[in-house]
């Protein structure tokens, strides 16, 4: 039976949330762009998320045809960390079921995102009998190894992720690396998992101006070089590794720094209570590179193409990335990527072809990669062309079709077992 109506669950963050905040990133882009493409292909998609502000509407249809974002009340109207949602998941599930019952809605499949939403999808399966596919996006076991912090609840999360694995009818993994992590750390079987990467809207990131024009529009030297970081400002993104690499360059290749600028896109540089932002700003001063660094703050998706085009390279030195949407966006813009050899980045970025791999937390290695790019314009241009070509294989239209085939397979299996 072809799937025609999907309930997509994203409890803790809306696909319409402003980019660059503490809760927003690649998952928001994934849900928004996938839903838009599914709607374009004639599939009805209802995205359920928690209402966190009194100005949130009940229903927002701005993503595109056949797509609705539905805001459900569960707990106080306050912005929360992901972990703070856990105690209100039953309330969220009840609100979702009430919304569907009042409108006599039935869904062919549920597609849940992140561990909180997987908990809800499992409860809906118990109540409705509706099968569900799940995408973890990040894994608690990996976070526990790399990014444990005071607010983190690893035991609750990992236990829930294990329960989701037992209940879900299919797990969607972004990369073979995530598939391997699920099999190794969660004892998933190969049959439970289908690897389908996220996509990219290539048309959105195609160059509308030259790199010279883009840099000039950002107030930079048109004939200079710009290194770019885009993402949340949090320790596991390892922005400090980039600052340390610039300090290495200051010692090893000071002439190169005269035409170099590093721009950080993400977070709010004027928010006094952001400890990681404050630490990075102070660190740039302590290393004597603050005049080379600018903190641009978060930017909406519509603004990013100009930044990617202006960049000589995008740098992603993360400790952990399940996929790396920023890398794919940069590649679609024809910009090489220097990325740590972790998670999905090791599959997405092709070493020496679309950019460079580097060991995580090794600023000297990163500095070497930067020197190679800046001292060899021909190689940089060749990498940019290769990056653009590779990115075209990740078109959302094809990714959506692949997911639809999986959804149809899961729904057909339900009919056979009925």
Task: List each language-model region with its residue ranges.
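N-terminal subdomain of nucleotide-sugar transferases
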Residues: 1-69
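Short alpha-helical donor nucleotide-sugar binding micro-motif in glycosyltransferases
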Residues: 298-299, 306-311, 403
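Conserved acidic donor-binding segment of nucleotide-sugar-dependent glycosyltransferases
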Residues: 351-352, 356-363, 372-377
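Short hydrophobic beta-strand element within catalytic cores of glycosyltransferases
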Residues: 336-339, 349
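Aromatic "clamp/platform" in nucleotide-sugar-dependent glycosyltransferases that forms part
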Residues: 319
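Carbohydrate-associated surface elements
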Residues: 177, 199
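Nucleotide-activated donor-binding/catalytic signature segment of Leloir-type glycosyltransferases, i.e.
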Residues: 274-299
